[in-house]
């Protein structure tokens, strides 16, 4: 597998993918004007790597992200992927406090690693799913550990405001 860093300055992140991601964007139903951006790479029949970015308008992101908020997000992920949460808890990703969960599909076939990283007006969800033991394997860790934010200037520009000039 050939891994390469993918950068999305518009969404404020970089991550290594094992291929070129397909990108889609949609408004989140019932949450207008919240937008969802998905970047996804599939490998073979049963392995996928994705970064989902929820982008809120300036000042509209959740102001208090606590354990309950994270639990609701990972429960929604598990429900959407027909998986059962096996392990969850706080984690540091890209130098930021976040949340991590491991889930299984109940058939013993797919294993998911999910990380949630809030940053400014965005919430990043890194998810990878693959065959048994994938969530604790080298490729899943490589994917998670390669994630980084591309700086506050990028976020300010994408929000429509230029950073203040240096004095």
What positions do the PLM features span?
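A short acidic-to-branched-hydrophobic micro-motif
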Residues: 38-68, 125-127
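A general boundary/transition motif marking the beginning of the first structured unit of a protein
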Residues: 9, 61-65, 135
């Amino acid at each position: 597998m050939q891994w390469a860093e993918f950068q999305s300055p518009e969404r404020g992140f970089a991550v290594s993918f094992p291929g070129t991601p397909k990108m889609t964007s949609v408004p989140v139903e019932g949450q207008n004007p919240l937008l969802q951006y998905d970047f996804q790479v599939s490998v073979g029949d049963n392995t996928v790597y994705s970064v989902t970015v929820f982008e809120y308008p300036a000042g509209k992101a959740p102001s208090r992200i606590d354990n309950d908020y994270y639990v609701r997000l990972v429960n929604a992920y598990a429900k959407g992927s027909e998986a059962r949460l096996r392990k969850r808890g706080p984690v540091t990703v890209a130098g930021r406090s976040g949340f991590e969960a491991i889930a299984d599909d109940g058939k013993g076939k797919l294993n998911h690693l999910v990380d949630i990283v809030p940053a400014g007006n965005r919430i990043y969800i890194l998810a990878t799913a693959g065959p048994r033991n994938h969530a604790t394997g080298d490729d899943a860790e490589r994917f998670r550990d390669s994630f980084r934010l591309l700086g506050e200037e990028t976020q300010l520009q994408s929000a429509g405001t230029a950073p203040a000039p240096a004095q």
